[in-house]
Curated annotation (Swiss-Prot):
Tetramer of two alpha and two beta chains. Keywords: Amino-acid biosynthesis, Aromatic amino acid biosynthesis, Lyase, Pyridoxal phosphate, Tryptophan biosynthesis. Belongs to the TrpB family. Its EC number is 4.2.1.20. The lineage of its organism: Bacteria, Pseudomonadati, Pseudomonadota, Alphaproteobacteria, Hyphomicrobiales. The keyword Ribonucleoprotein does not apply. Its cofactor is pyridoxal 5'-phosphate. Gene3D superfamilies: 3.40.50.1100. This is Tryptophan synthase beta chain. It comes from Mesorhizobium japonicum (strain LMG 29417 / CECT 9101 / MAFF 303099). CDD domains: Trp-synth_B (cd06446). It is an enzyme of class 4 (lyase). PROSITE patterns: TRP_SYNTHASE_BETA.
Length: 416
C-alpha cells in the first residue's frame, strides 16, 4: 500500500501464482487450497478498496500511533564519529532510527495485525490463530483480537515461552490462549507447524494471522503491503528532514516482515544501498545460526519456496539465534528473490555483536532496542565509521527490548 511500481521495477511482484521469480508460490495441503484461494480473492478485493484503506489508516493513526518517528540518533552518530576519528578515517555517517518500537504493543507487528484483523472481519471469520517467536506478533495478534472481540490462540515454541515470559504474560492478560509447542527445538518453525495443523482442522471459522512475510501466497504479499507503511513514511520523513534520500538502509531479517516493510518503497531508488541482517548466531562455520541466505539453499517450507537451512536430504535444520524473532530456518520469498537479483545485500551478525550493539544503544541513546533490531544496529556500527560525514543511514528499530532483558541479563551473568 505504497506508491505504484514503475516499468522495469523491483516492486512488481508477485505474479498471479504468487511467485517472485523462482520463489514463493502456494505449496499447501489439498484441504487448505480452497481457503487460500478464498483468502486471495478477498485480499484482491480489499487491497485497493478505499473504505478498507480508510479504516486501516484510522486505526493505524488513532490506535497504533502512526506515523512512527524518524529519529536522528545523535548519541550513536557522535560515538561512531569518535570511532572513525580514532581509526584515522575522519568520517562517520549520520544515523537515523525508524522508531517502530514506539508503536502500540512495542514493535512493527501491529501494522500487519491491524490489516489482517480487518481482512478476517471481511471474511466473516470467528476465531484467530497465530504463531510467535519473540512474542511480539503474539502480543499484537492478541491485542487486535481483544480490540475486535475475537477468541485468539497463539502457538509459541516451548523454548521461546521460557525466554520470553513477559510477552507470554501479556498475551494471557489480553485474553489469548498460549499453547506451548514442544516438538522439534520448540522455536518459531515448530510453532508455525502447529498453527498450520490447527488451520487445516478448523478451516471454516478460523483465520490464520501469519506474522511474517512468508507462508503460501497471498501472505507474503499482504504482509509486505501492510508493513510497507514503514518505508513509505521513512522515505517521506528523510526527504523532509534532510532534503534527500538516505545512502543506506538496514533492517534485521528473520522471516523478514519489518525488513521488507522498510525496503519495498526504496527498491527502485537505485542509489540507496539496502542491507538485510541475518542471525549469524555463534558463527556460520557450524549449524548454530539462522543465516538461511548466506548458508542455506532453496527449498519448500510452510507453503512457499525460499532459501532454507536444510541438510543434504532436504530435512529442515533447527538453527540458533540469541534473538527469538530471528530464530527461523527460512526467510520470506521476496527476500530470496531480492538476494538472487542482487538488489539487496544480506549479511550475518553474530550473537555477541548484537549483544554489544544492544548495550551500546542503551548507553548512548537511552533506548533499549529489541535484540532483533540490535542485529541491524550492529551492522551500522561496523560500516558507519568508514562512511563520509555527509552520508545518511536509516536503521529500522523494529521493536523495543523490554522483552529481552532477562535473556541479556543471563548472557551477561546478571541476576534480575
Amino acid at each position: 500500500m505504497d506508491q505504484p511500481a514503475t516499468p522495469n521495477s523491483f516492486r512488481t511482484g508477485p505474479d498471479e501464482q504468487g511467485m517472485f521469480g523462482i520463489f514463493g508460490g502456494r505449496f499447501v495441503a489439498e484441504t487448505l487450497m480452497p481457503l487460500i484461494l478464498d483468502l486471495e480473492r478477498h485480499w484482491n478485493e480489499v487491497k485497493n478498496d478505499p473504505d478498507f484503506r480508510a479504516e486501516l489508516t484510522d486505526l493505524s493513526t488513532h490506535y497504533a500511533g502512526r506515523p512512527s518517528k524518524l529519529y536522528f540518533a545523535e548519541g550513536l552518530t557522535k560515538h561512531l564519529r569518535e570511532v572513525s576519528s580514532a581509526k584515522g578515517l575522519g568520517g562517520g555517517a549520520k544515523v537515523y532510527f525508524k522508531r517502530e518500537d514506539l508503536n502500540h504493543t512495542g514493535s512493527h507487528k501491529i501494522n500487519n495485525c491491524l490489516g489482517q484483523i480487518l481482512l478476517a472481519k471481511r471474511m466473516g471469520k470467528k476465531r484467530i490463530i497465530a504463531e510467535t517467536g519473540a512474542g511480539q506478533h503474539g502480543v499484537a495478534s492478541a491485542t487486535v483480537a481483544a480490540r475486535f472481540g475475537y477468541p485468539c490462540v497463539v502457538y509459541m515454541g516451548a523454548t521461546d515461552v521460557a525466554r520470553q515470559s513477559p510477552n507470554v504474560f501479556r498475551m494471557k492478560l489480553l485474553g489469548a490462549e498460549v499453547r506451548p509447542v514442544t516438538a522439534g527445538h520448540g522455536t518459531l518453525k515448530d510453532a508455525m507447524n502447529e498453527a498450520l495443523r490447527d488451520w487445516v482442522t478448523n478451516v471454516e471459522d478460523t483465520y490464520y494471522l501469519i506474522g511474517t512475510a512468508a507462508g503460501p501466497h497471498p501472505y507474503p504479499e499482504l504482509v509486505r503491503d501492510f508493513q510497507s507503511v514503514i518505508g513509505t513514511e521513512a522515505r517521506a520523513q528523510i526527504l523532509e528532514q534532510e532534503g534527500r534520500l538516505p545512502d543506506t538502509i538496514i533492517a534485521a531479517v528473520g522471516g523478514g516482515s519489518n525488513a521488507i516493510g522498510l525496503f519495498h518503497p526504496f527498491l527502485d531508488d537505485k542509489d540507496v544501498r539496502i542491507i538485510g541482517i541475518e542471525a549469524g548466531g555463534r558463527g556460520l562455520d557450524g549449524i548454530e545460526h539462522c543465516a538461511s541466505m548466506n548458508a542455506g539453499s532453496p527449498g519448500v517450507l510452510h507453503g512457499n519456496r525460499t532459501y532454507l537451512l536444510q541438510n543434504a536430504d532436504g530435512q529442515i535444520m533447527d538453527g540458533h539465534s540469541i534473538s527469538a524473532g530471528l530464530d527461523y530456518p527460512g526467510v520470506g520469498p521476496e527476500h530470496s528473490w531480492l538476494r538472487d537479483s542482487g538488489r539487496v545485500e544480506y549479511v550475518p551478525i553474530l550473537d555477541d555483536e548484537a549483544l554489544e550493539a544492544f548495550k551500546l544503544t542503551t548507553r548512548v541513546e537511552g533506548i533499549i532496542p529489541a535484540l532483533e533490531s540490535a542485529h541491524a544496529i550492529a551492522h551500522a556500527v561496523k560500516i558507519v565509521p568508514a562512511m563520509d560525514k555527509d552520508q545518511i543511514v536509516i536503521v529500522n528499530l523494529s521493536g523495543r527490548g523490554d522483552k529481552d532483558v532477562h535473556t541479556v541479563a543471563s548472557m551477561l551473568g546478571m541476576e534480575i
